Curated annotation (Swiss-Prot):
Alphabetic keyword roster: Cell membrane, Disulfide bond, G-protein coupled receptor, Glycoprotein, Membrane, Olfaction, Receptor, Sensory transduction, Transducer, Transmembrane, Transmembrane helix
Stated name of the protein: Putative olfactory receptor 52L2
Annotated Gene Ontology cellular component terms: plasma membrane
Lineage: Eukaryota, Metazoa, Chordata, Craniata, Vertebrata
Localization of this protein: Cell membrane
Species for this entry: Homo sapiens
GO molecular function, one term: G protein-coupled receptor activity
Residues carrying covalently attached carbohydrate according to the record: N20
Length: 319
């Protein structure tokens, strides 16, 4: 199967997953509450969220523009950074506009299919972002442990294939979400206690059995995060081992500094994400509005901070 036919297959699978004709019952629209318990303060909460979204848009578009326009930045590190910026734009834009509309003007209704599309883009591209962080760790490993062969190992063809694998993984893992959700029967109460269509928030509204949905969602989350964090950890273990062999403190600090921006981005992405995931799944005593706020911030804070981190930590981007 060639690349074109494979992507055609993926597209057909996605269309089938979203198609109403495959299922017996028409599905209702949903109503997004926003931040339950903080309805009176939602206008004020929307202000910092809007600023974060604006920072994400300006910062990531700027990163993409700089890398596109400067041929000297067409290297593996910056090409992976451009992938990260593009993904951050999608993640932020798939949630923020609707969330802000809910908080500011009470535009709470969202169609069933639109809800699924929003959820698909949010979760699929978050998975892709995790994959790009693994690719960036691989790039740092090759740059530090095999510096003389860096350009031959990670040439543009290899970078393109890595990007394709990251994209396909995100799509393949999330298409079953849509298929499983389409099989659920929803009760009359279609009110989502959230500001956007989050997977578990939608699953909890179903009247039918949701064990498979819950199990698959948990499996995908643990699989993606577990394997990706393991890969990043192994890469940095080798990097640390190589750097400690470098003679002289100044040379070691210089080697470590090349990884500084990537380490910051990893921490910004995984720590809030894991905290949000664990509190949503297992933090039954945590107030619901805290769950929602954490989930919204997780979709906006990394896209807003990543360009700032790379601007400060990377000399070429700063210049």
């Amino acid at each position: 199967m060639n690349l074109d036919s494979f992507f055609s297959f993926l597209l057909k699978s996605l269309i089938m997953a979203l198609s109403n004709s495959s299922w017996r019952l028409p599905q209702p629209s949903f109503f997004l509450v926003g931040i339950p318990g903080l309805e009176e303060s939602q206008h004020w909460i929307a202000l910092p969220l809007g600023i974060l979204y604006l920072l994400a848009l300006v910062g990531n578009v700027t990163i993409l523009f700089i890398i596109w326009m400067d041929p000297s930045l067409h290297q593996s590190m910056y090409l992976f950074l451009s992938m990260l910026a593009a993904i951050d734009l999608v993640v932020a834009s798939s949630t923020a506009p609707k969330a802000l509309a809910v908080l500011l003007v009470r535009a709470q209704e969202i169609g069933y299919t639109v809800c699924l599309i929003q959820m698909f883009f949010t979760h699929a591209f978050s998975s892709m972002e995790s994959g790009v962080l693994v690719a960036m760790a691989l790039d740092r490993y090759v740059a530090i442990c095999h510096p003389l062969h860096h350009s031959t190992i990670l040439h543009p063809g290899v970078i393109g294939h890595i990007g394709m694998v990251v994209l396909v993984r995100g799509l393949l893992l999330l298409i079953p979400f849509l298929i499983l959700l389409r099989k659920l029967i929803f009760c009359q109460a279609t009110i989502i206690g959230h500001a956007y269509c989050e997977h578990m928030a939608v699953v909890k509204l179903a009247c039918s059995e949701t064990t498979v949905n819950r199990a698959y969602g948990l499996t995908v989350a643990l699989l993606v995060v577990g394997l990706d964090v393991l890969a990043i950890g192994v890469s940095y273990a080798h990097i640390l081992q190589a750097v400690l062999k470098v003679p002289g403190n100044e040379a070691r600090l210089k080697a470590f500094s090349t990884c500084g921006s990537h380490v910051c981005v990893i921490l910004v992405f995984y720590i809030p994400g894991m905290f949000s995931f664990l509190t949503h799944r297992f933090g039954h005593h945590v107030p619901h509005h805290v769950h929602v706020l954490l989930a919204i911030l997780y979709r906006l804070v990394p896209p807003a901070l990543n360009p700032l981190v790379y601007r400060v930590k990377t000399q070429k981007i700063h210049q």
